[in-house]
Every structure is written in C-alpha cells, then in structure tokens.
C-alpha cells in the first residue's frame, strides 16, 4: 500500500506541474489552474503519508481520494460543482473512474 501511494502521489505532483507547463492543445486533461493546484496539494499530502503515515492514514487517503475521483467523474457528467472550475474533458472522466475505483479497492483490500 505504501508503494502504491508513493507512486500515485508522484504522478499527482507530475500531473499538477505538467498542467501548468503544457499548452492546452497538447494536454490530455483540462489544465485548469484550480485542477493543477488540486493535484499538487493532494500529491504532496499523499507523498507525506507514504513516507511518514501509518497504515490507517494511507488507507484513509486512498479510499478518500478514490471517492473524490469517482465523484469528479459523476460531477462532470451531471454538471455538478466543481465542473466549471476544473473544466474536465472526456479523458478526465475515464481517468477518474479507473483511478477512483482502483484506489478505493486498494484502500479496502490493502
């Protein structure tokens, strides 16, 4: 679980940075500033938990972030908050469902 969280946190930080650097036409995801900040903050938090957190904290993060990802996919389809701020694209929706379900499963199954 610790390794999965460390890798996932690194990917979140990378996605957050790339969102600020890549031109929107070349980005797979929306690149909205609020969305990039979201990825950076949760990536740093996940990395800190992977380094210094206990199993319960890591499990809570994985399940919680997975649930947030699943909510984001649903919010995008139903035009709920924060769709306007994050400006999701169809690729974001697919990633949110796949990553969200995987994180919840890893958090539950350990």
Per-range role (PLM):
Residues 1-110:
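Membrane-interface extramembranous regions
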């Amino acid at each position: 679980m610790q390794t999965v969280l460390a890798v996932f946190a690194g990917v979140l930080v990378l996605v957050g940075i790339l969102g600020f650097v890549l031109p929107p036409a070349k980005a797979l995801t929306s690149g909205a500033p609020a969305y990039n900040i979201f990825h950076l903050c949760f990536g740093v938090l996940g990395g800190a938990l992977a380094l210094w957190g206990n199993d319960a904290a890591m499990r809570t993060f994985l399940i919680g972030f997975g649930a947030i990802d699943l909510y984001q996919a649903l919010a995008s389809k139903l035009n709920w908050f924060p769709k306007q701020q994050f400006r999701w694209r169809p690729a974001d929706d697919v990633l949110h469902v796949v990553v969200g379900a995987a994180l919840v499963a890893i958090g539950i199954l350990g």
